[in-house]
Amino acid sequence: MYAENITNAVEIQDIRAREILDSRGNPTIEADVILADGSMGRAAAPSGASTGSREALELRDGDKSRYLGKGVTKAVANVNSQIRSALLESDATDQQGIDNILIELDGTANKDHLGANAMLAVSLATAKAAAISQNLPLHQYIANLRGQTSLTMPVPMMNILNGGEHADNTVDIQEFMIEPTGFSSFSEALRAGVEIFHSLKSVLKSQGLNTAVGDEGGFAPNLRTNEEAITVIMQAIEQAGYKAGKDIHLALDCAASEFYKNGQYILAGEGNKTFDSQGFSDYLVKLTEQYPIISIEDGLDESDWEGWAYLTSKLGKKVQLVGDDLFVTNPAILQEGIDKQIANAILIKFNQIGTLSETLDAIYLAKKNGYATVISHRSGETEDSTIADLAVGTAAGQIKTGSLCRSDRVAKYNQLLRIEQQVRASYRGGEEFIGLRG
C-alpha cells in the first residue's frame, strides 16, 4: 500500500500550457505539469534567430493578423489536448518514458506535428515537477537521470559584443565572447566577466561608439572589421586589470551559415570581402595566431563538411571547434561528425531536438567520444534557468548564456551562483579546453 501511494504521488495529474513572451517580445510556450502530490514544474521554450536547417521544428501559427504570425496557439493547443491526454497518470519520474511517449505521439523526424517547442516545455516541466516531488534540486535530479556522480561548475562563454543576426550593426561575426579561464571558482570568474563588460562600455564610449546592446545583452557598435571587435575587447580586458591569454581567453561564434552564399563566405561589413572554404578557414587560423582565441563555434556553414574537415585538421588539436548549426543537438548527426572527425565540441540547445532525454543522449555521446559540451541558451530567451541546472548536473564544463545584462541572461548566472553555494562542484577553468589542458 505504501509503495502504491508513492507511485501515485508522482503520477501526472494535470498539464496546462499558455502563451508567454520571450526576451524579444515574441510569443513562446510555457507549460505546467502538476503531480498527484501537488508538485508543479514549469518550463518555457526558448527560440533562436540564427537556426540550423536540421533543427526540430518550432511550431508557429503563421496567422499574420496576430503577433505578426509568430503566435504559438497551435503548440499550446497541442499541449492542452493531445499531449495532456497521452501523459495523464504517467509516472513523472520516468523521464525516458515520458519523452518516448512525446516522440511517438509526434511521429515525425523533426517534431513538426506537435512542435518541438510544445514537446520541450512539457518534457522540462515534467523533470522539474519530479525533482520537486523528490525534494531534489533540479541539477541533482538531472545528474541522477544518467548516473552523473561528479558535478562541475561551467566556464561561462560571455557574449559581450554582438554582431550578425543578433544585432543591427555592421559586424559579420555573430558573437565575440570572453572566457574566464584563470579562476578557481565560478563566482570569481563571473565577477571578472562583469568587470570586463563594464570596462568594454567605457572603451566603446571613449571611442565614440554605440553602447546599445543586442539580443543577448552584448554591445552592438558599428565597427570596420571583425578584428576591430577583438581589439576593443582586448583593451577592455587590460583596462579591467586582467591578462588576456592568462586570466581571460576569447571565443567566437561565427554563425557562418548566415553569410555563406553560393559556396562563398561573404563579409558584408568588410566591403563584401569573399572567401572560399579554405580561405575562410585560414582567416580563422590567422586570428587564433594573433589573439588568445580558444573556441570557435560554427566557423563554417552547416553543409560545408569538406571545409569543416580542413578547419579541424588545421585547428582541432589546439582550438575548441564547436558545432551548433552543424550538429543541432542531434545524436545521429553528431555521430556522423564523430565518424568523420569533424569539429571537437558540440553546442547543446534543448529546443533543437525537443526533449530532455534526447538532449542528454547528445551530451553523453559527445562525452563518450571526447567531444567537449557547451550548454547554450537561445537569442530569444525567458526567465527560465533550466540550462544552468543542466550544465551542472551533466558536468558539461561550459555554458553559453549571453552577456552580463538583461534579466533573461542574468537569470542563468544567478542560478549558477545559487548552485555553487549549495554543492561541492569544482570550477576547472582552462582545463575544460583542448588548447589549455596541462
From Swiss-Prot:
Family matches, as SMART domains: Enolase_C, Enolase_N
Residue positions of the active site: 216, 349
Family annotation (InterPro entries): Enolase, Enolase-like_C_sf, Enolase-like_N, Enolase_C, Enolase_CS, Enolase_N
UniProt keyword Magnesium, yes or no: yes
Localisation: Cytoplasm; Secreted; Cell surface
GO molecular function, one term: magnesium ion binding
GO cellular component, one term: phosphopyruvate hydratase complex
Cofactor dependency: Mg(2+)
Keywords: Cytoplasm, Glycolysis, Lyase, Magnesium, Metal-binding, Secreted
Cofactor binding: number and manner: Binds a second Mg(2+) ion via substrate during catalysis.
Pathway(s) this gene product operates in, as recorded in its UniProt entry: Carbohydrate degradation; glycolysis; pyruvate from D-glyceraldehyde 3-phosphate: step 4/5
Major localisation: cytoplasm
Enzyme Commission code: 4.2.1.11
Cytoplasm in keyword set: yes
Binding site for Mg(2+): 253, 297, 324
One example of a Gene Ontology biological process annotation: glycolytic process
Enzyme class name: lyase
Coiled coil: none
Binding site for (2R)-2-phosphoglycerate: 174, 349, 378-379, 400
Endpoints of the signal sequence: none
Catalytic activity annotation: (2R)-2-phosphoglycerate = phosphoenolpyruvate + H2O
Protein family membership: Belongs to the enolase family.
Subunit-level organization: Component of the RNA degradosome, a multiprotein complex involved in RNA processing and mRNA degradation.
Role noted for this protein: Catalyzes the reversible conversion of 2-phosphoglycerate (2-PG) into phosphoenolpyruvate (PEP). It is essential for the degradation of carbohydrates via glycolysis.
The protein, known as: Enolase
Organism placement in taxonomy: Bacteria, Pseudomonadati, Pseudomonadota, Gammaproteobacteria, Moraxellales
